[in-house]
Amino acid sequence: MRLTALVSGHVQGVGYRLFVQRYARDLGLHGYAENLSDGKVEVIAEGDEDALNRLLHWLRRGPPHARVQAVDTQYSEETGLREFHIY
């Protein structure tokens, strides 16, 4: 399963992508987190449904200095990503 999440709020410049990468790797997920020009962070993660749901919990919480306002999600089929990167 593949999760696409657009995270809005104060999520850039606060270590959000590194936070996401750490939890994604711990959960055995593959994908990436990327800052977007509109101030959002896009997270693409692939793996089993339980791990994706657990990651979604952390996406909504964020690191201490982040202020997550919304997480818009979409699910689709996996595409075979490997590792978890930050862009």
UniProtKB/Swiss-Prot annotation:
Pfam families reported in the protein's UniProt record: Acylphosphatase (PF00708)
GO MF term (any one): acylphosphatase activity
Domain Acylphosphatase-like: 2-87
EC number: 3.6.1.7
Key words of the record: Hydrolase
Keyword field contains Nucleus: no
Residues of the active site: R17, N35
Reaction(s) catalysed (UniProt annotation): an acyl phosphate + H2O = a carboxylate + phosphate + H(+)
InterPro entries, per the entry: Acylphosphatase, Acylphosphatase-like_dom, Acylphosphatase-like_dom_sf
Enzymatic class: hydrolase
Similarity remark: Belongs to the acylphosphatase family.
NCBIfam families recorded: PRK14433.1
Protein name: Acylphosphatase
Organism: Deinococcus radiodurans (strain ATCC 13939 / DSM 20539 / JCM 16871 / CCUG 27074 / LMG 4051 / NBRC 15346 / NCIMB 9279 / VKM B-1422 / R1)
Native organism taxonomy: Bacteria, Thermotogati, Deinococcota, Deinococci, Deinococcales
